[in-house]
């Protein structure tokens, strides 16, 4: 586990550090720092892409710093243009509120599962829905020139196709978040994905210009697979953390299907295993890649983190039933039968003891 002095070294080794502001290392080593990361509630659940900033916050908290997970109940009313080729439809206020509550609960469970202390959960709707337009333009807008905003990648990429004032002004709202958290919690570090660099640095500038405070930024890389595909996307779509949207079996299978060239990197990024444990798994995998021991451990660790150890064990058992056709059906327990019928498409059978595993495999695959 990293300390305040070794946090950046730990994040670098784990592949979680892409960009950072000058002087951040000394800032982290000198005192207890409060860091925050935003989570967008435009969907009813977090997805596995959100695990990267989540892991960043967990490592920050475990190193002895404080962390804030900020649900964007206010900014989601506007929509972030970063990485979008066209305007997003605006979700209703009721939908965003419901999503924010679900994501708040998910984040609470994740930080508890990671055994972290010093993590605060907040929602920017608490201040963004209360600030007046004139006050916002005077207190925030005056610190940013139009030229500065036009130079941001999220705006530049939309100049030709068009961008509404709503999305154009998004970075000011996110910058205001940083200022509010600086004033309320003494927050001096924002973390996020590298695609958020423009928005995050705007917040850093606002803290410095408006409050005269020290503020820093740290981003993680956007992840692609060794074959060049975007991480977290499957033919069925996103891989969600909510078991009603992506079953624990499907979640487990996503990780166990990791390419050989990616498994070591994912073990470092998405698990809390030590350097020695991961290096041992990599050595074992290099000797016998067909055994897929590293992939199995990756699937077990991440599924346990998201869904709990018991559910992860069942997901592993179901995976074994589905892919090991030599397995004797008589040895399969009732909980595994029940999970198969719940999680496997087409596995609708009259009773657990009447289940024909070979028929199941034919139906499902």
Language-model region placement:
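Conserved nucleotide- and phosphate/pyrophosphate-binding catalytic cores
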Residues: 210-365
